[in-house]
Amino acid sequence: MICLAALAVAVPARADEAAAVRDKPNPTLAEVPASGYVPFTGQPFFLLSDASYGTDQEAMVRLEAPGREYKDELARYGGADILVYRVPQPLDFLKAQKNLHRIDVKANYTGEGLANTLAYLWDNWTRQARRAWQRVLSFATRSKAVEAAPQFSMGDQMAAPTRFSNPPQYAPLKGYELLGRFRYPIWEAKPIAPPKDVKLEGSSSEWMPQNVGNVMIPVGKLPAGLYIVEAVIGAYRAHTLLFVSDTVAVTKGTSQGMMVWTAERKSGKPVAGSAVSWTDGVGVLASGTTQADGTAELRHVAPERSYVLGVDRAGGVFISENFYYDSEIYNTKLYAFTDRPLYRPGDDVRVKFIGRNFRSATESTAPAAGDIKLDVIDPTGAPVATTTTRLSGETGADARFTLPSNAQAGGYTLRFDYGGSTYGGAFRVAEYIKPHFDVNLSLDKAGYGTGEAIKGKISLRYPDGKPVKDGKVSVSLRAQQVTMVEGELQYAGLFPVKLEQQELTTDGDGNAALTLPAAKEPSRYVVTVFANDGAAYRVKVTRELLVARGAAPYRLSTAANFTTPGQSVSFNLQPLPAVDGVRGASAPPAKWELVRLESRTRTEGALQPDAKGSATFPVKFEQPGSYTLSVRDAAGNLLAASSHWVAGDGVQTVPGNIEIVFDRDRYQIGDTAEALITFPQPVDDALLTLERDKVERHALLSGGGDWLALQRVTPSQYRARIKIGAEFSPNMTFSALTVRDGDMVFQNAGIVVTQPALDLTVRADKAVYAPGETVTLDLSSALAGKPVPANLTVSVVDEMVYVLQPEVAPSIVDFFYHPRRNSVRTTSSQSFISYDLALSSLPGKPGGTYGRHNERGVKVLERPRRDEQDTAAWVANLQTGADGRARMTFTMPDSLARWRVTVRAVSTTGAADGIVGQRTASIRSDKALYLKWTGPSRFRESDQPRLDMVAFNQTDKDITADWIVSGAGLNINQRVTLKRGANYLHAPLSGTPALQAGIVNAELKQDDRVSDRLQTTVKLDATGWLADRESIVPLTQLQGTRLPLGLPADARDVRLRVVGNTASQFARVADDLIEYPYGCAEQTASRLIPLALAQQSLAATGARLPDGNPAGTQGVDALLRTQRQRLALLAGTNGTFGWWGELTSSSALITSYAYYADWLASRAVGISLPADNWKQVLEAYKRTSQNEPLLHRALALWFANEMGLPVATPLSGVAAELARNAKAPADAEPAPGDSLIFVAPDSPRGRQVAAILTAQLMRQVGQPVPEALVSADIAARTALANDTSPLVQSLLLMGGGRSAADPAPLLARASAAMPTMDRAVALVWLQKGLGGLQGANVAAIQPVLSAGGWQAARSTVGVPTWRWAGAQPPAALDLASTPSDVTTQSAIVSYRSRAPEASRLPITVERKLYRLEPVDAAAPKDDAKAPKRAAADVTANAGITFKAKPVKPGDTLDSNALYVDEVVLTPRQGTYRYGLVEVPLPPGAEVEATTWGIQIDGLKGEPNEGNGPQPFERRAAYEMGQLSYNQPVPTLERPTALRQLVRFSLPGRFALPPARYFRMYQPEAKALQGDGKAASYPFKVE
C-alpha cells in the first residue's frame, strides 16, 4: 500500500507531464479533502495566587475562566494544563521584576504540532487505499478473504471521522526546573462558593452567582521556595507566583523606615537569620537580617508603595506589599476662628489667627512672621471679601471685614494663604427674620420621664399681642430612642420614627392644648408645629424634647477597669449635674445587677444611697470574665451602667480578635498604665509595640522590655504595665500582634495622655449687669498652678447665637494637640496577591471576547433687646503679665441676654511655650422690667398711628408698675399689670396735631423708682412726595461768619458739603451716584463705578477711612462687595444683562456696562477672575447689537476694549454704519435733564458723540479711521465744543479737545438730578482725560457744631460733610471763623422738599386693594380608604386658596389680613420705556417676600377670569423704600396691572400720597394717581 501510495503521489519528471497529471483524476488515490479542522484557540482567563503556603499545606492557585459564556467552547480542551516550576534564585528573580504582582516571564510557544495533521492524512489515505483494493478485487474474493482473516474487515472505520486531540501549544519555560505537569478538569471541579451556612443579607453571598470555571487548583505540597505556576488553555496562557515558606513576615512601615518581624507560621515564635530586602520595584532601598527576636530595622524614606522580600534559612520565600501615606503632617498649623459662628448680612466679621510650627506631635515653635492673604468665599463659591494681615509669632494676626448687606445665607469659607500653604476656616450666615405671628410651644413641666404623658400649650400671637383666633395648627411628632452609656445619653437609632399627626384649632385666646403620648423608653421627641392663620404662608416651629428615664441619670465609676478573680471592687455612684437646672424624676437607686457575659449569670444586691442619691458599694468578682454592672431604681429603670473585666482563664474574645483593656481612659505623665491583653487562643509569642509617628518601642511577649513589664495570667491572657513618659503626650498607640497557624492577628489600643493646657479663669465684677453698664472682666492664665504670661483672645457673644448655630471652630487645645493618628502601617506576607490575565501568543492583536463591557431665614421671636449687637466685645490681643493677670472692660449692650465669654490663649514664653488653653464663662444683662419699641418710628405728618411697646417682665411673678410716656404727642401715666414674659402696651395719641416729631420718653416705675427708661426718636415726613434738591451757595456770599442758605420752609434731611477744585467736585458726584436710591442693572453698575474709582484712589494714596458717619455706614470696600453681589443677582440668561434683571431682554450696552463695572470693582477689591468671564460681553454684542442704536454699540465696544477684549472687527462695522447713516432721519434732541444715552441716542447729538467715540477708539486700537468718519469726527467736535453737557465735555477732554483747567465747572453741572449712567460715564472719561485724581481738598470752613444744629460726618468716599439735626431747616450757616479762601469754594446744600407734582404723561394710574379671604377646601368624598390622611391634607393646604374681595373707599383694613395691592397703568397714547412706579405704604406695612404658591379667585383682568382660583404671580419685581415700594416697568404700551401681596400691621389712620409713574431717564415726565394730591381714600387699619 505504501508503495502504491508513493507511486500515486510521485512527481513527474517533466513540467508538461506534471500538467497532464494535474488535469486528470488519480486512478488510485483521490486528493485529500479539506478537513474543516480549526486549531483550538480558547479564551482569556485569570490565574492568581492570593495566599502563601507552608510546607505542610496543599498549595493552591485560583483560575477564573469565562465559564458562563464560553463553557461549551472551552470544554473541548478538557480543562487547563498546569505546569509548576521552581525558581532557582528567588531574590534575584524578584528584584528583577518591574511588577511583582504580574511578573514578566517569556512564554515558550510552539503551537500544537503535526499530530492532528498526520492523523487526518493517515485516516484519509487508509480509506482511499482500501477502496483501491476494492476496485482491484471482486466482491467474492474480498468476502472469502475476510472469512479467512476477519481482521481484514473494516466495519464502521471507513465512515468514522478522524479523532483530533488538543495537545499543549506551549513548551515548558526555559531556565526553570519543571516539577510537575497535569491537565486539571476545571469544568468538572466544584466552583468557589461561600460556605453553606453563610447567609448574609445584602452581602456578596446573596447577589454574586457561582461561576462555573472559577476554581481552586491544588498543585501539591511543595518544599520551601518560590514557584511559578503556569496555566494553558489552547493558545492562551497565564502564570503566577507561588510563595511557600514556614515563615511569615510582618512589616510595620513608617515615613522614615520599616521594621520587619519574622515568625513561624505555625507557632508564632520569632525566626532569626532571615534575609530581607526593601524595594520600591526599581531598586533596593535597604537590606538586613532578622535578629534573635525576629526583627530587622530598615532605614530609608518610605515611598508610597514598596515591597519587602525575604528568604529564611530553610529557603522559604515571602513577600509583603506596603503602602504608606502620612496620617499626620507636621508643619505650620494655623488656627482661625471668628468672634461668633453665625452672622447676619451686613455684619462685621472679626477673625483671629494663631499659629504654631510643629516638628513632631509635641514639639512646636512660634511661626515665622509673614503675610496672610484672606479670601472669604460665599456658598456659591464667589469671593465676597479679600484682605491681608500680618502674622506675628507671638500674638498671631487678626483681620476684620464686613459682609455684604445682601450676603446669601449658608456656609462661608475662610481661605487664607501663608508661607505657600493654603488653610481654611468657616462660619455661617443667616438672615434673622420675624414671622408675621409668633408660635410659642410651652410645656406644663420643665422635664419629663418615661411613662409620663407630655402636656403643654401652643400659643399664636400677632406682633401687637392680639391672639390668632381659629388658627389651624398641624403637629407632627417623631421619636428617636436613646440609650444611656456610662451615664451619657446617646442615640440608639439613626432616624426618628413618626408617631402621630395632630390637627388642632386655636381658641379665642389663640391657644391650643397639646397632649403627646408617653414614651416607654428614653426618647428624643421632635415636635414640628405648622401654624396657619388663613392669611399667609405657614409658620414652622420645631422643638426637640428629651424624654429621659424616669429617674435622674447617674455616673457609675471605679478606680480600675479590670481586676483579678476574688477581688472586691468598690464602685462609686454619683448623680450627674442638672442640665439647665432641670433634672428628671427623683426615683432613687434601689439595687445593682451584675451580668457575666460569657455565661449570662446574674448577681444582684441592694443599695442604700444617701439623700443626694450617691452611693459607694463593693462588688466581689469570683470568676474571670467580662461583666456589665447596672444600677436600677425600684421600678427597674436603668440609671447607670459600666463594664468591667476580671483577668484569668475564662475571659473570651471574638475569634480572630485580640482584646486590650486599659485600666483607665486617660493618664498623666508619670503614671503607670496597666493593660489586660486577651488573645483569641493560647500563644507562644507575640510582638508588642508602641507606635505613633514610628515604632517607638518594641518587645516580645516572651521576653518583655525595659518599657513594659509583663505578667502571664493564663496561656491566652497577659497583664502589661507601661510607664507613661512625656513622649507619650498627647497619645500613643499600643499594639499587640501574633501569628498562629498561618493567620496574623493584631489589635491597637490608644493610650491617651492629658495634654498640659493653660488654666484660664474669667471673673466678672458682677454676675448680672444692667444694659449700658461697664463690664469688667479679670482674666488670669496659669500652668500647673503657676501664673504664666499668655496672649488671650476674648469674645463676648449673645448666647442665642449658639442656640441657632453651635460653635464651628474646634477647641484650640483639640486643634493643636488633638490625639495623633497612628502613622505606622502594619501588613503581612499573607496578603500578597500575584495574578495574570491569559493572552494568546498567536499573531495579531490579543484576541478573545472576555471582559468587553434658597434661602431661608432663621426665625427669631420677639426678644428684650433694643439693638442688634450680637457681639458685645472682641479683644483680639490681650496680654497677661508675669503674674498671669489681665483686665478688660466694655459697655453692656442694650439687651437682656445671657452672654458667653470665650477665652482662647497661647503662651510663647519659657517652659509654657506652645501651651494653649480655652475657657468659656457666662455673664448676664438683666432687668426686672424692660421696655422695647416694636413699631416703626418714621411716619407722615398727618398719620394717626397706634403706637405699641412691649414690656418684658423678667421675674417669675406678675408685677404692677406705672407706665409713663411723654413726647411726640404722647401723654400717658397709667398703672399696668405685667405678666411674666412679653406684655403688649398700646399708647393712644393725644393733642393737636396728634403726632409730632421728637423724642418719646417712656418709663416703667415701681414704688416711684424707675425700673427702665426708653427713648425713641419719632421722625415725620411730608404727606406728599419728597424730591431731592441741591443749592449751590458760593462762599463769596459770606456775611462775616454767616452764610445765608435760602432753604424752603419744608426742607428736611439737610446736608452741607464744601467743594472747590476738580477732585472735590469729583467726590461729590461720586457720593451722589452711590446714594441714588433705585437699583436696576444700569444704576447698580453706575453705583459700582464711583465706588471702584474711590477705592482705587484711596489705595493709591494709602488713605484709610473710618466706618463712615456716626450711624455706622459700611466702608467703601463693603459697599463694593454688596453692589457686586446685587449686580450678579440681576444677571439673566447666559450671564447677560437687561435694564432690570430678567424682566427685560438682554442688551449689548447694559451687558457691556455691567461687566465693565464689575471689572473695575473686582480689581479694586483684589478679586481675580478668569479671562473667560469677560467673553460674555462679545457674545451678547453678537446676539443683540444689530437692534441697538449706534451710540449704544459704540459705548459697548469702548467698555469691552477697556477690559482688554478684541473689538477691531465690530468697531469697523460701527464706523461703516455711521458713514451710511450720516443723513438718515434722527430723533429729536433731548430736553435739558434728559439722558442722552437712553432718551435720544439717535438724535444728531447722539450720533455726533458716537462718531467721536468710534474714531477715538479706532485710533486707540491702531485701526485706520475711514475718511468719512474722520470728517464726521471733526465736524462733531466743532459742533459740540460749546455743549454744556458733562458727558459730552468729558468725552472731548478724554480725546484731548479741552484743557485740564475746565473740569471743575464742568463737574459742577453734574447735579444729582442728572441721569445716572450719563454721570458715571462722565466720571470715567474725566478721570482718564485727567490721568487720575489726587483726592479731594480739605474743607476750609468749620461750622459751629451743636446737638440741635450742625453735626460733622463723612461721606462714603471720605468727604467731610455736615448734617442738620434741628427741628426746623437752618436759615444760615454759622462758621466758627472766617475762611481764608472764599473765591474758589462753594457750599453745596442737599435737602429734600415737596416735589411739584403734576401729570405730564397721558397715562392713567389706578390703585386698588383686594382683601384675601381664605376658602375652605372640602375633603375628597371618594377617598374612603384614608379619611385621616385626607383631613390632614386639607388642613395642611388650608389658606392656600383665597377669594379676592375688593376694598371700598372708607373700608377699615384688618392688620392681620393679607391684601393684594394692584396698580393699573393705562397709556392713552404712545409707548414708554424705562419707567418706574412708586407706591406709597402706611407705616408698618410690608410686602410679602414670596407668593408661596397661593391661588386667588376674583381678581379682575385675568385672562381666564371667572374660571375659579388662579395661581397668583407677581407681574414685576419690587424693592422696598422707607414708606413705599417701587416696581420697574420696562415698556408700557398697553394697560398693565402690577400686583403685590401686602400687609398693614400697624393700626391707625393714614393719609397717603398718590401712586406715581415716572420715566427713569426723564424724571420730570410723570403720571399720578387720581387728582395727583392724595390717594383714592385714607387708610384706616384696625
UniProtKB/Swiss-Prot annotation:
Keywords: Protease inhibitor, Signal, Thioester bond
Cross-link (Isoglutamyl cysteine thioester (Cys-Gln)): C1080-Q1083
GO MF: endopeptidase inhibitor activity
Highest taxon of the lineage: Bacteria
UniProt key word Signal: yes
Residue ranges that the Swiss-Prot or TrEMBL entry lists as coiled coil: none
Cited InterPro entries: A2M_N_BRD, Alpha-macroglob_thiol-ester_cl, Ig-like_fold, Macroglobln_a2, MG2, Terpenoid_cyclase/PrenylTrfase, YfhM-like
Signal sequence residues: 1-15
Alphabetized Pfam families for the sequence: A2M, A2M_BRD, MG2
SMART domains in the record: A2M, A2M_N_2, Thiol-ester_cl
Keyword Metal-binding: no
Xref: Gene3D superfamilies: 1.50.10.20, 2.60.40.1930, Immunoglobulins
Role of this protein: Protects the bacterial cell from host peptidases.
UniProt similarity note: Belongs to the protease inhibitor I39 (alpha-2-macroglobulin) family. Bacterial alpha-2-macroglobulin subfamily.
Protein name: Alpha-2-macroglobulin
